Amino acid sequence: MTTKIYKFIPLTLLALFVFAPSLVLAHQPRITESRQTQVPSPEISKAYYSKLTGESDVYVIQASEPFDLYVNILVPDIAGQKKDVSAVVIKDGNVEKPLAVLDGIHFEWKKFYEPFGADSYWMGPEYKARAVAGMYEIRVSSPNNDSKYSLAIGEIEAFDGKEGLNALTVIPELKKNFFEVSPISFIKSPFGWGLIVVMYILAFIVGFIYRAILKKFAKNSPRGVTKNIGKPDRLIRTAIGVALLLLAISTSWSPILIFFSGFAFFEAIFSWCGFYAAMGKNTCPVE
């Protein structure tokens, strides 16, 4: 069943794009894992999240043809965060004559709310230009090289099912480590509550299909009954549904956990357990 659920996830994400239009305005989130990062497809909008650790971070673009270059610095709107992050755009290693200097120290940062992740930022300096082919470096730093930042590169929004899956992995980690809040806060995002709604709908659909199949092939046996669990079992399933949902939204926002939470609620609401049905077990009077 788990494999089948994973096959449904891209469709789930597509449904989220239909019901939550603000998703198409999102950058592809990335967590920077080293001091030097290669940036593929620089025109595609991406947001790199990192914290300076004593040295500058460098983002490298290798362009074989002209492209539209866009760079923007942001920092999280959290207590104690300094608005002192700057960046230098360099072409072909020409440090003496940089293309642009994004001076965050003397810039008037503006507050910015991003609905995709339901997060608040301070938006800093940006740079936009038509760039020729060549190698570009974006060097990010702060006076003490100890600040958190998000570096947005590219303006073309491209957010498909694959990127949706990546976002589900990245955003809970960003909530905890970058914005220093509980992953539960992601529920304020249309992507967050939309994921719960769609996975619950999917769980109910699977439940109805499974029940219909068992009833069709087991009309004259306990497996074919409409109800097969009593009140105590329904309460247990309700508790399981709540527990799985809380576990999911407070940790990784796993679609699988949310799906099984929805399935537990399905069993509780309709007094029917698929496992009991398969075994021919019944804990409530048959009407």
Regions found by a protein language model. Give the residues of each.
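C-terminal edge strands of extracellular/lumenal beta-sandwich accessory domains
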Residues: 27-36, 59, 85-93, 127-203, ...
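Small-residue packing motifs within transmembrane alpha-helices
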Residues: 8-11, 16, 190, 194, ...
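N-terminal pre-first-transmembrane soluble regions of secretory-pathway and organelle membrane proteins
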Residues: 1-67
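Hydrophobic beta-strand segments within beta-rich accessory/binding domains
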Residues: 58-79, 136-142
